């Protein structure tokens, strides 16, 4: 269900004056429901003139706040369909390469390649990524009048500096670092972004504007309009504006640093655009476009207009119809004992205010963790329990977790932490997770299982192929970096030899001239030319290798992008396949039939049939249910047993059970939840009507879907194995 609405962009900063207002930051995107304007008596067409409307009530998509804002502070963008907030598909995300023990330059090159996209590095009210701000402030402080800035390459490795800043940017003292190293790190930062600051989608229009318009004033206005929202992403626009301010400041000191707008545009257009296989004409037009933008003053802002008169609003009494007496187990937002990784997956790319509650990782009875989406990141808040009361911090005042959560669904968490100015708006419901299976008969579900499993296998093969290529390319890059270092050392040795030869040759040439020995003179000159020629050959070889390395590094980044674009699909396909498989298992479908749909007739894997269900010792609960045993006794019983040997015991957590199983020669423990929907290791898998039903399912299904370190099935009941 969606409604019609309008979008506006903030032109000025506004600090709220009343409780019902919301803050505005330059560039914020706001949405207003059409119905709210109709209710105020405004007709179609007037939405495009917000300054005539006065105060509008809407939703700030950038900050996640809803309230009133002045129409004189915004501009109209266009119409938009407004839908209730739903989780978005997971976009590709670059993953950092695991650091190795060796700190060679090749390793540094590899580790410094991945960078998060701009949208993941910062969010308004920040005007640019913190790392970028720190670099440019240091460059402007140390090198504003430097005559070689951005044109002299430093001897240090900028990747090492960027990696250091990435880890702990606040603690690094840039005063001690040479300005050319900082400049190289800045250029490297722009080059390593997964996507260019200026998106490819606007290249053609920028070139046309730079080529066709004769008046610089007209061109500036149209270019400014082109590079604003919604043509480019919000973070890209803010970052580009920050860069242009930096370039403008440098160009104002061009009499000393020799960096006018033209020179700066030539230096930075390749990393701002990354236009592949561009003709020289296209490149020239893009350089001209950047030159025009740099020449424009970006620091000055027009003063904000006067606020429109604001009518008094009637006060409303908040109606809290939420049930504080509800059991925690029945709350849709309570997920029990799930891992932090699963929580991150469920909250990925959701709106600010999305939340869920799980058991605290400390496993202390009564302690829980609230995970809340704020500013595009997950915020973890501990819920403490003491003397029958709950809360985030002392004094604990709430009678239950449900009462605590319901309170903050109406009130901002700024009461607890000023930086968390958001309400608990959108619960992640555990009851909506099982609606994946839409078909209503077993045969239709089986066909869909076969379809999803086939897609999963194809994606897996594609990912494996890319991973092999990724690994091979990484190794080749390291080898080429090592070879370039060897070339550098060789060139250094030859140049020293050449200098030595020149120094001594002068004396001998003078001597042989006096003696009239032309033959010896020719021999000395020939040897010198031969040495020079050899140096040139080595330098050419190094240059070709550097070009190959540059191309291969681009390929490496492209492979990494493709892998990250496939990974979300792979994860989603696996989850969907497993949900279909679980649905069929719950309906009592035999393993033989499942294997046919999965294509496992002749292949043994986690879904293969080991032995007929009727013959399994698992049917006798006495072989694995040891009652009220503790962790130490369980470990003693399982010590020395083969992988897959297990038992089930009562847990120290009231109302739950624990499964102890041997994995890779070690005994591991995991909680079995008992909920209103059934037994299970985690939501949404708490579906089994009895412990026996759960044990029979995981006899042929690996626990790895719940925990990466538990790649094992419940194969051998502890007492059944002893009786054998």
Curated annotation (Swiss-Prot):
<feature type="domain" description="Rho-GAP">
    <location>
        <begin position="113"/>
        <end position="301"/>
    </location>
</feature>
<dbReference type="GO" id="GO:0034143">
    <property type="term" value="P:regulation of toll-like receptor 4 signaling pathway"/>
</dbReference>
<dbReference type="Pfam" id="PF00620">
    <property type="entry name" value="RhoGAP"/>
</dbReference>
<dbReference type="GO" id="GO:0045671">
    <property type="term" value="P:negative regulation of osteoclast differentiation"/>
</dbReference>
<dbReference type="GO" id="GO:1990578">
    <property type="term" value="C:perinuclear endoplasmic reticulum membrane"/>
</dbReference>
<dbReference type="GO" id="GO:0006366">
    <property type="term" value="P:transcription by RNA polymerase II"/>
</dbReference>
<dbReference type="GO" id="GO:0042307">
    <property type="term" value="P:positive regulation of protein import into nucleus"/>
</dbReference>
<dbReference type="GO" id="GO:0030183">
    <property type="term" value="P:B cell differentiation"/>
</dbReference>
<dbReference type="GO" id="GO:0033120">
    <property type="term" value="P:positive regulation of RNA splicing"/>
</dbReference>
<feature type="site" description="Arginine finger; crucial for GTP hydrolysis by stabilizing the transition state">
    <location>
        <position position="151"/>
    </location>
</feature>
<dbReference type="GO" id="GO:0005943">
    <property type="term" value="C:phosphatidylinositol 3-kinase complex, class IA"/>
</dbReference>
<dbReference type="GO" id="GO:0035014">
    <property type="term" value="F:phosphatidylinositol 3-kinase regulator activity"/>
</dbReference>
<dbReference type="InterPro" id="IPR032498">
    <property type="entry name" value="PI3K_P85_iSH2"/>
</dbReference>
<dbReference type="GO" id="GO:0016020">
    <property type="term" value="C:membrane"/>
</dbReference>
<dbReference type="InterPro" id="IPR000980">
    <property type="entry name" value="SH2"/>
</dbReference>
<dbReference type="Pfam" id="PF16454">
    <property type="entry name" value="PI3K_P85_iSH2"/>
</dbReference>
<dbReference type="GO" id="GO:0005829">
    <property type="term" value="C:cytosol"/>
</dbReference>
<dbReference type="GO" id="GO:0005737">
    <property type="term" value="C:cytoplasm"/>
</dbReference>
<dbReference type="Pfam" id="PF00017">
    <property type="entry name" value="SH2"/>
</dbReference>
<feature type="modified residue" description="Phosphoserine">
    <location>
        <position position="154"/>
    </location>
</feature>
<dbReference type="InterPro" id="IPR008936">
    <property type="entry name" value="Rho_GTPase_activation_prot"/>
</dbReference>
<dbReference type="GO" id="GO:0120183">
    <property type="term" value="P:positive regulation of focal adhesion disassembly"/>
</dbReference>
<dbReference type="GO" id="GO:0043560">
    <property type="term" value="F:insulin receptor substrate binding"/>
</dbReference>
<keyword id="KW-0728">SH3 domain</keyword>
<dbReference type="GO" id="GO:0001953">
    <property type="term" value="P:negative regulation of cell-matrix adhesion"/>
</dbReference>
<feature type="compositionally biased region" description="Pro residues">
    <location>
        <begin position="84"/>
        <end position="97"/>
    </location>
</feature>
<dbReference type="GO" id="GO:1903076">
    <property type="term" value="P:regulation of protein localization to plasma membrane"/>
</dbReference>
<comment type="function">
    <text>Binds to activated (phosphorylated) protein-Tyr kinases, through its SH2 domain, and acts as an adapter, mediating the association of the p110 catalytic unit to the plasma membrane. Necessary for the insulin-stimulated increase in glucose uptake and glycogen synthesis in insulin-sensitive tissues. Plays an important role in signaling in response to FGFR1, FGFR2, FGFR3, FGFR4, KITLG/SCF, KIT, PDGFRA and PDGFRB. Likewise, plays a role in ITGB2 signaling.</text>
</comment>
<dbReference type="GO" id="GO:0002687">
    <property type="term" value="P:positive regulation of leukocyte migration"/>
</dbReference>
<keyword id="KW-0832">Ubl conjugation</keyword>
<dbReference type="GO" id="GO:0051491">
    <property type="term" value="P:positive regulation of filopodium assembly"/>
</dbReference>
<dbReference type="GO" id="GO:0005634">
    <property type="term" value="C:nucleus"/>
</dbReference>
<dbReference type="InterPro" id="IPR001452">
    <property type="entry name" value="SH3_domain"/>
</dbReference>
<dbReference type="GO" id="GO:0008630">
    <property type="term" value="P:intrinsic apoptotic signaling pathway in response to DNA damage"/>
</dbReference>
<keyword id="KW-0677">Repeat</keyword>
<dbReference type="GO" id="GO:0001678">
    <property type="term" value="P:intracellular glucose homeostasis"/>
</dbReference>
<dbReference type="InterPro" id="IPR035022">
    <property type="entry name" value="PI3kinase_P85_nSH2"/>
</dbReference>
<dbReference type="GO" id="GO:0048661">
    <property type="term" value="P:positive regulation of smooth muscle cell proliferation"/>
</dbReference>
<dbReference type="GO" id="GO:0043125">
    <property type="term" value="F:ErbB-3 class receptor binding"/>
</dbReference>
<dbReference type="GO" id="GO:0006606">
    <property type="term" value="P:protein import into nucleus"/>
</dbReference>
<dbReference type="GO" id="GO:0036312">
    <property type="term" value="F:phosphatidylinositol 3-kinase regulatory subunit binding"/>
</dbReference>
<dbReference type="GO" id="GO:0016303">
    <property type="term" value="F:1-phosphatidylinositol-3-kinase activity"/>
</dbReference>
């Amino acid at each position: 269900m969606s409604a019609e609405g309008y979008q506006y962009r903030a032109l000025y900063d506004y600090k709220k004056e009343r409780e019902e207002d919301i803050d505005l930051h330059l560039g914020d995107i706001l949405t207003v429901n059409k119905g709210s304007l109709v209710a105020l008596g405004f007709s179609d067409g007037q939405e495009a003139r917000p300054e005539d409307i006065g105060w509008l009530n809407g939703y700030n998509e950038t900050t996640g706040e809803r309230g009133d804002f002045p129409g004189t502070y915004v501009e109209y963008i266009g119409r938009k369909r407004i839908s209730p907030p739903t989780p978005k598909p997971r976009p590709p995300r670059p993953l950092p390469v695991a650091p190795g023990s060796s700190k060679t330059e090749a390793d540094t090159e590899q580790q410094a390649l991945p960078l998060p996209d701009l949208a993941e590095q910062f969010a308004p009210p920040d005007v640019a990524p913190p790392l970028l701000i720190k670099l440019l402030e240091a460059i402007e402080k140390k090198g504003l009048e430097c005559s070689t800035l951005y044109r002299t390459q430093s001897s240090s490795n900028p990747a090492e500096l960027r990696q250091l800043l990435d880890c702990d940017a606040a603690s690094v003292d840039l005063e001690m670092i040479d300005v050319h190293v900082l400049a190289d790190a800045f250029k490297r930062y722009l080059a390593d972004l997964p996507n260019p600051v200026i998106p490819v989608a606007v290249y053609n229009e920028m070139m046309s504007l730079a080529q066709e318009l004769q008046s610089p004033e007209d061109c500036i206005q149209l270019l400014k309009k082109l590079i604003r929202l919604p043509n480019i992403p919000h973070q890209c626009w803010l970052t580009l504006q920050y860069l242009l301010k930096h370039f403008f400041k440098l160009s104002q000191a061009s009499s000393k640093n020799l960096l006018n707008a033209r020179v700066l545009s030539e230096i930075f257009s390749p990393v701002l655009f990354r236009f592949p296989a561009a003709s020289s004409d296209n490149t020239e037009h893009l350089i001209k476009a950047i030159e025009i933008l740099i020449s424009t003053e970006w620091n000055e802002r027009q003063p904000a207009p006067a606020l429109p008169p604001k009518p008094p609003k009637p006060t409303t009494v908040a109606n809290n119809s939420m049930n504080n007496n509800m059991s925690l187990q029945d709350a849709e937002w309570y997920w029990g004992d799930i891992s932090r990784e699963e929580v991150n997956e469920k909250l990925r790319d959701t709106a600010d205010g999305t939340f869920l509650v799980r058991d605290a990782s400390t496993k202390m009875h009564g302690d829980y963790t609230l995970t809340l989406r704020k500013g595009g990141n997950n915020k973890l808040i501990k819920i403490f329990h003491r003397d029958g009361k709950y809360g985030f911090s002392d004094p604990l005042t709430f009678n239950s977790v449900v009462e605590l959560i319901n309170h903050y669904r109406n009130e901002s968490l700024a009461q607890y932490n000023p930086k968390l100015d958001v309400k608990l708006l959108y619960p992640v419901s555990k009851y909506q997770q099982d609606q994946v299976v839409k078909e209503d008969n077993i045969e239709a579900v089986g066909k869909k299982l076969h379809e999803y499993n086939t897609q999963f296998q194809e994606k897996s093969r594609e990912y494996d192929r890319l991973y092999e290529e990724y690994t091979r390319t990484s190794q080749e890059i390291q080898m080429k970096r090592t070879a370039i270092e060897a070339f550098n050392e060789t060139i250094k040795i030859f140049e020293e030899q050449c200098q030595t030869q020149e120094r001594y040759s002068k004396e001998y040439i003078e001597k042989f001239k006096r003696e009239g020995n032309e033959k010896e003179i020719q021999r000395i000159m020939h040897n010198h030319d031969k040495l020079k020629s050899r140096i040139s050959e080595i330098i050419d070889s190094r240059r070709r290798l550097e070009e190959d390395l540059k191309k291969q590094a681009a390929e490496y980044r492209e492979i990494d992008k493709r892998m990250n674009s496939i990974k979300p699909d792979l994860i989603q396909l696996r989850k969907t396949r497993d949900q279909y498989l679980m649905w069929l298992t719950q309906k009592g479908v035999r393993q033989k039939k499942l294997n046919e749909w999965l294509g496992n007739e002749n292949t043994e894997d986690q879904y293969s049939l080991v032995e007929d269900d009727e013959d399994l010792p698992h049917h006798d609960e006495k072989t694995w249910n040891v009652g009220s045993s503790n962790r130490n006794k369980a470990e003693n019983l399982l010590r020395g047993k083969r992988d897959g040997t297990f038992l089930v015991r009562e847990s120290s957590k009231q109302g739950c059970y624990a499964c102890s199983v041997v994995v890779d020669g070690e005994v591991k423990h995991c909680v079995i939840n008992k909920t209103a929907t059934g037994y299970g290791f985690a939501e949404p898998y708490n579906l089994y009507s009895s412990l026996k039903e759960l044990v029979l399912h995981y006899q042929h299904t690996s626990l790895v879907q719940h925990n990466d370190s538990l790649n094992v099935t419940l194969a051998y009941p502890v007492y059944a194995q002893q009786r054998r």
